[in-house]
Amino acid sequence: MVMEKLGDSLQGALKKLIGAGRIDERTVNEVVKDIQRALLQADVNVKLVMGMSQRIKERAMKEDPPAGMNPREHVIRIVYQELMEIIGKGADIQLKPQTIMMVGLQGSGKTTSAAKLARYFQRKGLKAGVVAADTFRPGAYHQLKTLSEKLNVGFYGEEGNPDAVEITIHGLKALEKYDIKIVDTAGRHALEADLIEEMERIHAVAKPDHKFMVLDAGIGQQASQQAHAFNDSVGITGVIITKLDGTAKGGGALSAVSETKAPIAFIGVGETPEDFEKFEADRFISRLLGMGDLKSLMEKAEESLSEEDVNVEALMQGRFTLKDMYKQLEAMNKMGPLKQIMSMLPMGMGGLGGVKLSDEMFQATSDKMKNYKVIMDSMTEDEMADPKLIGGSRIKRISRGSGCSPEDVRELLKYHKTMQTALKGFRGGKFNIQKMMKKKMGM
């Protein structure tokens, strides 16, 4: 999960609140102290943290809970709202034809983000392409070309041409029929006069709808200075924060950018194209607090899965064969790493009320799922359609064919039976996602 350490610390503070006998001033002070510690360790500005802490204490003691909400839920709601205040709202990204100019310092992940951004829009049904206008950094052309080919997005570049403005003009002409045109500009080690001049010249010919500044989350609170400097020089409409998965200073970067009033547009949370998300503060904070993000999970499923992947009608009628389970495992694999999917589930399903799994346990579970697919590849069509056919002799045959032990085959059959029982429970109305979404935080 993004900023896992901060999320664990915040969830630990809320668990203390949930486990308290009664919500009094002492309990609130203890919880606030834990939240303070978590935010300061994430490099959030001290002044912001102290201001937020004071507001949580005052509101928790003075405000009456809204109708239908108990004191515990009310305090959690206050924490949620105050975190929203210091993180800020995301940028308004519309799915329509537009030109985007990428700016930022060298090493921020700008070129990679340009390709991932194109892929993001392409997944949303828009034709996207990139223009390689970074003529300053050796290798920038080849890097963007390779990434574009890998992600199957449009590309335009002129290897050896040192004129970034000319390349931009030619590139936008070449990508004229594309919905989304992204211009990757050069970075520097500092915001120098020649960089500003080049960006202004590119801006004049590109006439971009958006100028996104790319920042490395590892710089923490320094993000504020960079965002201010770029905004004053060329004006920015949004910020992309990269490498949020690999630093303890992500909270500092997020809150510092918010303080500049420059909206956060996207966040990079890993190496793959799927680890690039539109930033939505409410969803982000929900995941941090262990409340899940079912909306993002559903969107990810819609983008990744086809009707052939999951036969919803059959599942809801209680029909769940090994063939269905095989498709389900393949579908989960398309949606991304198991750990990332689990972080989107609310408390009691992987969040606050769930069991905390280590990286090793997630890996072991993923390996087991792959093993199950190997075992099922050694079964006949009849066996996949009706697991009751699989007796002792068939288990031995499947075991030999898959290279797995008979115990592994039996474990798979037991897992299938458990899943079948669980789905019958869902069918009976014990699991109502819509109801859960409406109840969540009373919002």
UniProtKB/Swiss-Prot annotation:
Pfam families: SRP54, SRP54_N, SRP_SPB. GTP binds at residues 104-111, 184-188, 242-245. Its EC number is 3.6.5.4. It is found in: Cytoplasm. GO terms for cellular component: signal recognition particle. It is an enzyme of class 3 (hydrolase). It catalyses: GTP + H2O = GDP + phosphate + H(+). SUPFAM superfamilies: Domain of the SRP/SRP receptor G-proteins, P-loop containing nucleoside triphosphate hydrolases, Signal peptide-binding domain. GO terms for biological process: SRP-dependent cotranslational protein targeting to membrane. Keywords: Cytoplasm, GTP-binding, Hydrolase, Nucleotide-binding, Ribonucleoprotein, RNA-binding, Signal recognition particle. GO terms for molecular function: 7S RNA binding; ATP hydrolysis activity; GTP binding; GTPase activity. InterPro entries: AAA+_ATPase, P-loop_NTPase, Signal_recog_part_SRP54_M_sf, Signal_recog_particl_SRP54_hlx, Signal_recog_particle_SRP54_M, SRP/SRP_N, SRP54, SRP54_GTPase_dom. Part of the signal recognition particle protein translocation system, which is composed of SRP and FtsY. Archaeal SRP consists of a 7S RNA molecule of 300 nucleotides and two protein subunits: SRP54 and SRP19. Involved in targeting and insertion of nascent membrane proteins into the cytoplasmic membrane. Binds to the hydrophobic signal sequence of the ribosome-nascent chain (RNC) as it emerges from the ribosomes. The SRP-RNC complex is then targeted to the cytoplasmic membrane where it interacts with the SRP receptor FtsY. Belongs to the GTP-binding SRP family. SRP54 subfamily. Composed of three domains: the N-terminal N domain, which is responsible for interactions with the ribosome, the central G domain, which binds GTP, and the C-terminal M domain, which binds the RNA and the signal sequence of the RNC. This is Signal recognition particle 54 kDa protein. It comes from Methanosarcina mazei (strain ATCC BAA-159 / DSM 3647 / Goe1 / Go1 / JCM 11833 / OCM 88) (Methanosarcina frisia). The lineage of its organism: Archaea, Methanobacteriati, Methanobacteriota, Stenosarchaea group, Methanomicrobia. The gene is srp54.
